[in-house]
């Protein structure tokens, strides 16, 4: 189908031969001819409307003068429209021709669709308006019906009340009629009332007739006598009801319904409250805090699709949503808020005063850290350490030229990584001790990393320069590989060559420390509550829990209530490193604190609080969090008991249960970490329990239950515990050097490993003939082609390069004699244990099996 636009459009024209025709103003017309198949055509008139609202006016005005009748009213308007209308069609015709020549079929179709859409929108709007009107009419009708129904019910209620009143009145009249004494006054009274209402002539006469009948009072004594006799008449009952009349049930019911309607219709003013919401809360408690009914909160949950009870616990997010839904303001409060304001209290700059520097001595084991500190302190600590190695963190103070320096000595053994990390965190300056006759070792590198992680400056102390093979320059060069640039190599790190044995250059080392401290401008506020870090903790017999702490801010005094980790207590005494009791501990002072409820973990921060109640609250919160972490860790590691047992059975892993008791928390931590590193895929150490303090009977009971061995590090078992262990057959091992402890546990765990099976190839033999011998079975006549064959060796039968049997050699004969072995090139006879499927051409491979004990 094609559309062609014809050029012979009929336009508005004025011709003498034709009648004057006028098109509608504001409408441009054009003709479009459509060509269909089979030669069919169709002409379509296309109109373009320009002004929508002036169409009717322009169409009606020019028609008026064309009417021949009514000449009188139209002489004035007739000439006016003609001069306006006659020239208008000419330019309009020219415009319509131009527009139709420019409009394409797509544009025409688009305009047609736009008109259709407009009509559809109008139709839809009209439908919506009708629907809204119908809905409003239905709503009005429903309200009218409700009003009519309410009026009808009210009328019925009034009619019912009226009927009840009439029935009651008739009953009273009937009762009075049956009673002779009361009958005449009742009739007279009724007649009087009727007469008064009518206002009749006999009113006076009737009123006069009432006077002689006035004494009606004998009725009451009669009723009382009848009541005393136990007889109850209708009259007496009715008269008694009138004397003590109460509201009827219907009246009470109507009153309650009216009260309920009033309560429902009454708009109560909503009081918005600030609801404090903890991390978990029950629905009942939340409703109480919102001053709402718990039933309403439960209904809200039911609307959300959740069936809840008032005693159910919900989380803080859900509680906040409920509070907001009920129009209240939620204030979230976490359990950790109990720790707010405990640490990091801002001090005013004018309150800060200079404090001594805290120096940590770090380095590899046996590089002379403790010896250097002994030389500085002029003491002998190394002699008191088991094995000559430091296994605790020691904190000391040294006076130099009127200035105080606090030293912290850390272990250098690989097992004490956590101790070194804690020492670096609590320090201001780190002294890296490196032996001049040695090189940079693994723990040296680890100490460098700890110091860099803590962001503290490093001073390199090159020790043992008094030895003949000392090479300090080699140490400086190796430190460059780990980004430690000393001053002599163009860096900014101070380095001092010292000798702890001879005391060489110790004064230079102290001067370097004071210089570095002066650069750092170390200050603290001593006039505030104390806070710091726990360096070490232990359980001492006779003194209880003892914690070595380093005061970092404020002043610690006896009597202060402190919280250290998950433990709290009131400070009973402060003891310095020389065992002397002190009254105060200013900033940068290491002291031993007595009075805690239990030994805290090394590395925990401590702070002084106002009251014991707050200290107890913080301690309980931290203990609860620690328990939750432990449970989550165990659940994540082991899962359920069935899963754990199935994993152990499938993997074949063996466990070595241990109970570890030590003198201080730091040593226990180091031992546990060292033993956990010994574990493999086949065997691992399981720490049933670890703690600081002596070995007690409870430890023996736990070991008996879990079938564990007890390890004591620098502690002993009391007599009761030893007796219980001997009776239960529990082994207790004592150690004072961590090397020996780790080596013994490693050897014991190695014994749990299954031995390694090793095969040694002996030789090959080819079957030449198969003999069937009575009482023996099939015997293979073979020639040894490679190696040798031994009696009792393991054999494999190979056929077509495929192993079809593996077993042991039963007999090995040569010329009817049993031999121990047959070398290559010789012939022999062989028989297998419990196997006789041998053929000529098979190859027998002989091998020896050895079981080798494995070690970790």
From Swiss-Prot:
| Keyword Ribosomal protein in record | no
Q: Where is this region: G4?
A: 463-466
Where is this protein localized, as stated in its record? Answer: Cytoplasm
Bias kind Basic and acidic residues: ranges: 108-177
Question: Where does the record place the region G3?
Answer: 409-412
Report keywords, A-Z. Cytoplasm, GTP-binding, Initiation factor, Nucleotide-binding, Protein biosynthesis
Q: Where is the composition biased (Low complexity)?
A: 181-190
CDD domains for the chain: IF2_eIF5B, IF2_mtIF2_II, mtIF2_IVc
Supply the name of the protein.
Translation initiation factor IF-2
Which species does the entry assign this protein to? Chelativorans sp. (strain BNC1)
Region entry G5: which residue ranges? 499-501
Query: What lineage does UniProt assign to this protein's organism?
Result: Bacteria, Pseudomonadati, Pseudomonadota, Alphaproteobacteria, Hyphomicrobiales
Q: Which domain of life is it from?
A: Bacteria
């Amino acid at each position: 189908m094609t559309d062609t636009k014809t050029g012979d459009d009929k336009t508005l024209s004025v011709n003498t031969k034709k009648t004057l025709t006028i098109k509608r103003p504001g409408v441009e017309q054009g003709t479009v001819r459509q060509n269909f198949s089979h030669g069919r055509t169709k002409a379509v008139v296309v109109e373009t409307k320009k002004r929508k609202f002036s169409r009717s006016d322009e169409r009606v005005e020019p028609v008026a003068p064309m009417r021949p009748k009514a000449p009188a009213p139209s002489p004035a308007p007739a000439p006016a429209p003609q001069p306006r209308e006659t020239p208008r069609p000419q330019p309009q015709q020219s415009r319509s021709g131009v527009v139709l020549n420019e409009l394409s079929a797509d544009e025409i179709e688009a305009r047609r669709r736009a008109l259709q859409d407009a009509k559809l929108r109008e139709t839809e709007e009209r439908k919506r308006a009708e629907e809204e009107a119908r809905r409003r009419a239905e709503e009005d009708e429903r309200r009218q019906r409700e009003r009519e129904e309410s009026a009808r019910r009210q009328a019925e209620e009034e009619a019912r009340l009226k009927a009840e009143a009439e029935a009651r009145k008739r009953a009273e009249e009937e009762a009075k009629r049956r009673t002779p004494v009361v009958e005449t006054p009742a009739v007279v009274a009724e007649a009087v009332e009727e007469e008064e209402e009518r206002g009749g002539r006999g009113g006076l006469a009737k009123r006069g007739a009432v006077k002689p009948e006035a004494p009606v009072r004998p009725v009451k004594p009669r009723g009382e006598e009848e009541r005393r006799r136990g007889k109850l008449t209708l009259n007496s009952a009715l008269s008694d009801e009138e004397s003590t009349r109460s509201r009827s049930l219907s009246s009470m019911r109507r009153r309650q319904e009216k009260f309920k309607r009033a309560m429902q219709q009454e708009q109560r003013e909503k009081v918005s409250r600030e609801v404090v919401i903890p991390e978990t809360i029950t629905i009942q408690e939340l409703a109480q805090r919102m001053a709402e009914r718990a039933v309403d909160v439960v209904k809200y949950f039911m609307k959300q699709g959740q069936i809840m009870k008032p005693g159910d616990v919900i989380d803080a997010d859900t509680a906040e949503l409920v509070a907001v839904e009920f129009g209240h303001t939620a204030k979230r409060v976490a359990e950790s808020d109990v720790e707010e304001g405990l640490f990091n209290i801002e001090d005013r700059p004018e309150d800060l005063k200079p404090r001594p520097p805290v120096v940590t001595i770090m380095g590899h084991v046996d590089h002379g850290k403790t010896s250097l500190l002994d030389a500085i302190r002029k003491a002998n600590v190394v002699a008191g350490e088991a094995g000559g190695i430091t296994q605790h963190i020691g904190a000391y103070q040294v006076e130099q030229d009127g200035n105080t320096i606090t030293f912290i000595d850390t272990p250098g053994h690989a097992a004490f990584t956590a101790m070194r990390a804690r020492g670096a965190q609590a320090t201001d300056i780190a002294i890296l001790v490196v032996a001049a006759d040695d090189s940079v070792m693994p723990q040296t590198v680890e100490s460098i990393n700890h110091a860099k992680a803590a962001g503290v400056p490093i001073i390199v102390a090159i020790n043992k320069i008094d030895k003949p093979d000392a090479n300090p320059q080699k140490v400086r060069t190796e430190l460059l590989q780990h980004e430690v640039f000393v001053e002599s190599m163009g860096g900014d790190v101070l380095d001092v060559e010292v000798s702890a044995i001879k005391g060489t250059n110790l004064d230079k080392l102290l001067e370097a420390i004071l210089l570095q401290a002066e650069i750092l401008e170390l200050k603290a506020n001593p006039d505030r509550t104390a806070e710091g870090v726990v360096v070490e903790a232990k359980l001492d017999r006779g003194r209880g829990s003892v914690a070595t702490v380093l005061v970092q801010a404020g002043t610690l005094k006896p009597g202060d209530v402190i919280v250290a980790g998950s433990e709290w207590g009131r400070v009973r005494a402060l003891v310095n490193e020389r065992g002397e009791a002190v009254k105060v501990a200013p900033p940068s002072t290491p002291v031993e604190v007595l009075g805690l409820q239990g030994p805290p973990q090394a590395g925990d921060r401590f702070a002084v609080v106002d009251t014991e109640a707050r200290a107890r609250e913080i301690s309980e919160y931290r203990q609860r969090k620690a328990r939750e972490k432990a449970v989550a860790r165990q659940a994540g590691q082991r899962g359920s008991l069935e899963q754990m047992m199935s994993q152990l059975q499938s993997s074949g892993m063996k466990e070595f249960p241990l109970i570890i008791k030590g003198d201080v928390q730091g040593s226990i931590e180091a031992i546990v970490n060292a033993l956990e590193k010994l574990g493999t895929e086949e065997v691992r150490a399981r720490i049933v329990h670890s703690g600081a303090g002596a070995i007690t009977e409870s430890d023996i009971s736990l070991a008996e239950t879990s079938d564990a061995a007890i390890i004591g590090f620098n502690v002993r078992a009391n007599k009761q515990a030893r007796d219980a262990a001997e009776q239960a057959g529990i082994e207790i091992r004592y150690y004072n050097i961590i090397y020996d402890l780790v080596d013994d546990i490693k050897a014991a765990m190695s014994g749990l490993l299954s031995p390694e099976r090793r095969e040694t190839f002996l030789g090959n033999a080819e079957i030449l003939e198969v003999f069937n011998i009575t009482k023996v079975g099939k015997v293979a006549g073979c020639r040894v082609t490679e190696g040798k064959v031994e009696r009792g060796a393991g054999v494999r039968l190979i056929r077509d390069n495929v192993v079809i049997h593996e077993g042991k050699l039963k007999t090995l004969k040569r010329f009817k004699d049993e031999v121990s072995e047959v070398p290559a090139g010789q012939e022999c006879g062989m028989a297998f244990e419990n196997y006789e499927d041998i053929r000529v051409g098979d190859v027998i491979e002989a091998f020896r099996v050895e079981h080798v004990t494995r070690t970790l």
